Every structure is written in C-alpha cells, then in structure tokens.
Amino acid sequence: MKESPLITLVKRHSETHFANIKYGYYVLIISLVYLIGLALLRAFGRRTPSRSSSAFKNKIIYRLYDIDPAIHLGILFFAVLIPFYYHYSLTTQSTVYLKRLGRLSYALIPLNLFLTLRPNWFLRKNCTYTDFIPFHKWFSRIITVIGLLHGIFFIIKWAIDDNVSLKQKLILKTFNFVGFIISILVLFLLICSIGPMRRYNYRLFYIVHNLVNVAFILLTPIHSRPGVKFPFLLLNCTLLFIHIINRIVFAKSLMILNKNANYSKTNLVHVRLPRAILPDYFEPGSHIRISPYRRINPLYWLLPSHPYTIASLAEDNSIDLIIKETSTAEPGSQIESLRSNPKSFHLDQEKTYTLINSYPPSVPEECYSQGTNIAIICGGSGISFALPLFRHFFNKENVKYLKMIWLIKNYSEYELVLDYLKTNGLTFEKKPSNNKRISVFISGEYTAETRLDEITTNIDDENSEYEMGSFNNEDEDLSISNFNSENADSNDKTPETSHSPTKENGSLIEVKSKHSFTLSNELKSFNNESAQVNQNETWLFSCGPPSLLQLSKKYCNDERINFVCETYGL
C-alpha cells in the first residue's frame, strides 16, 4: 500500500501576531469613556473655588474643570497603560510591546481629532475649542513621541541582532520601509514644533504639522500588521472629512468696511466688518477666524487662519475689531514694516477675505445670567475682549458692582478706543453709577504685590500658537512690571494725575498716568462686595499678556473668586 505523503503546515504568523488587536479596541473604549466623563464634568462639575475648602483642593478642582493637560493626560494615560504590560514576557517577547506602542499611538488619534472639531456639537454647550488647545498640544506631542519610539526601538532591535539584516528588514520590506518614512516625517515634525523653531517660523510648523498628520493617518494602515483599517482608519478619515466640511460650510467671503489706524503713534487699529457676516446673536467676547485666501486656494488649507475677538455686541450695526498689528519697525515707519514683514498679518480694505466661522468665548453660561459683582482686567488689545463684556454687564439692572481696568503703554491707544466709542455712540450716559467705572492706566508706577518682577513677557503663551499666529499683537511686551516711572514714555503728554478726559463719559472713565498700580487696591470695593453676594455672582475676567493673567489668577485663587481668562500673546 502506498503511503500518503506527510504534509507539514507552517504557521504564517507567530502566536503573538494578533496579540495587540484587543488592546487597540481597549484604547478606543477608554477614549470614549473619557469623552463621556469630560462632557459630564463640564455639564455638572464645579469650577468655582469653594470658600470652605482648602486652597490645594480648590486648585485641583479648578485644574480638573479647566482641562489642565497635566491632570487630564495623567488620568487618560493611567487608564490606557494599565493593561499595557500583560501576559507576554518583556525579554523573550519584546516585539509584542514594540508593536503595541505603534498601535497605541494610532488608536489615540480619533480622540485627538474629535477634541479639535470646530464646532464640536457633542461638547458645544459647555466647551469651546480654545479650552482644548493646551491639551491638544501636549496630547499630540505624546502621540508623536510614542509613534517615534515604536520605530526607534525596532531599528535598535534589528541593529543588535546578528541573525537579522537591518537593510533587509528596514529597507527591502515595503511595510517596514513605509514605517521608516513615517518615522522620518514625525521626527521632522518634532523638530519644527520646538518652541524657538515654532516661533521663528510658525507657518512652516503649521504646514508640516498638517501634512505629517495626514501622512501619519494614511500611511500607518499600509505599514501596520495586523491592519488598523477598521475601525481606526475609518474613524480618522471620517473625522478629517468633518474638519474639511466645517471649513467649507461655515465659511463666507467678507470685505473690510473701514479701518482706522495711525501707525505713527500706535499699532492698535480699529477695523469694521459688515454685520451680516455673523448670526443674529453671538455671546459677548466671541471671536472669529479670518483667512486671507479663498476656499479654492490651496493656501487656505495649508496656512494658519487668524483669530480676532469681536469688540461689538450682537445688537450693534457692525462687527468691530480692535487689534494690534505686529510690527518690528520704529514709530513713523510702521506701515512699511507691516507690509514687508512675513510674520505680520494685517487687514486691508481693498482685499477680500474668508471668514471661516465665529466661536463663543470660554465663559460659563451662569456668568452671563447670574453675575452681579464683576471685575474686568485687560492689557493692550485685550480691550476687544473686555469692552463687550463691560457693555453687557453695564446694561443689566441687577449688576451691583462693575469695574474694568485697562493697562496700556501710551495715550494714543486710549484715543483710538475713545474714537471707537464716539463713532458708535457709546457714551454710557443712560445709567450713571458710582459702582460702574472704567480705569485706564498708562505705563505708570507699579508696586508689586507678588514677585512679578521675575515674570517676563517672554513666557511662551502656548494657548495662542495652536493653528494660528493667534491674536496678532505686541501686547507681550506690556508686562505688569512695565508700570513704573522709568518705563513711562517721555513723549507721553498725559497728565500725572487722574482725570476724566471726556464730557460724554466723565462720570465713568478715569485715566491714570504714572500712578502705582496694585490689584488689591483697585479691587477693594469688588472684594468687599464679593463677601455680600453668593459665590456664583462674583466673577473676575482677565485678558492680556502672561504676567497680567498670572497676577489675576493668583488674586482669584487667594480670594476664592471665579476666574475667566483669555490669553493674548505669542
């Protein structure tokens, strides 16, 4: 009898080949749980510092509600990494964990893309996209580093293994070569994202950031084994498509109606846009994003747009912007510098721009409805955020105390805003009150309450560098420490005593030059009033350079006061 030949079947893959599939699904589930938890936190959480709780507990609660990257990323990665090391030996089956790093980086991308949607309908009621900018920056960096480590560790593993040809593994195998290309792109992105590089040429960083992200999303499924096409590639492509649709559907063309500028005195300018570009209602302190290119222009997609806070209220007849246009020139030659400086962006009446969309401020709804004791502190072009808030609360009958403090470098900035108020007929004459006032400080003497002499304006304002050169201005050199007599402009003819410069607003606006500025002194009445009202009725807003925000935030933490801020700086 003839014996049948023995057929030996050889496994195509080792027993660990599919070891990471379930882990990828686990990461996706954790991402979903995090989103649900985030929505619940913002809907029912408390950002108000309790007067009965310790300062440490209040700080943790505030950082948790404020989506502090250290807190939120710590929680997220603690959950993600719990089952990372499981079942397989790290010494004999290290390949499992090297592959797991790659799958982890790709499985986290859907969460990152989802949190940067604008608008984000799932979180729209209690969050704005600006809330996620610090989180997005650090989350993106971690995802990038994890993916890069995946590639580096494999190269090291093959290089030290005498039984493996590095060239054969890395170059001649198509799947691995694609991964090698991804690693090079990711490394280039990390180099461009280093602070000095990013600030030196933000446009380059932004272009590289977008192109590498798209390449990472599309090339990884070619490289990955086993595949990640479903559900990860499908989710990532869907979210990318939504990002693109948002930039098409909500965009509209606009023309500048008027521009009031005097570059020989100040870079602060007033720009007027048509009222029809925005919906009938928008919240005070909202901002818009403008691109100098049309939607059919590739540069519309490759280069960053520019955000501008709206200085108007919804009931106004036009949309007004009060902005600072970046310049490196000396006074008298500013306009030439603005036109030649590649880092600057300025709005011209003769050009057509694209309004990408309008976005609400990061201000809780209860602040608008319940706030009765309000203080607003701003520096430079931060007046564009502060002024509509002041007008909103000024018109409310139930507001018991309202004060706005504006810190500027020269009197010309005040003149421009005063002209804006006159042009729009905003005299605040209807409801005069001793408890409602605007104080303008012009580079006067400053008595430090905290060690702000150690705070420089070179602090990297990370919120403003995501997807834009942010609020184009030069307020970063408006440090609180500049409010002393040595820094006063010798050409400034502002009197040294307090005065009310206009008849229309004589009982409301006071200008102070060469005066010492201490926040506690300026807010004595505000602080006294806070002890007489419910905690959710007292709010302090701050907008300006980092040193001003730090001072305001510390004051609120010490006094257990609700704090809302918007950062202007580069």
Curated annotation (Swiss-Prot):
The keyword NADP applies. Residues 480-507 are annotated as: Disordered. Its main location: membrane. GO terms for biological process: reductive iron assimilation. InterPro entries: FAD-bd_8, Fe3_Rdtase_TM_dom, Fe_red_NAD-bd_6, FNR_nucleotide-bd, RBOH/FRE. Its EC number is 1.16.1.-. The keyword Signal does not apply. Interacts with ribosomes. This is Probable metalloreductase AIM14. It comes from Saccharomyces cerevisiae (strain JAY291). The lineage of its organism: Eukaryota, Fungi, Dikarya, Ascomycota, Saccharomycotina.
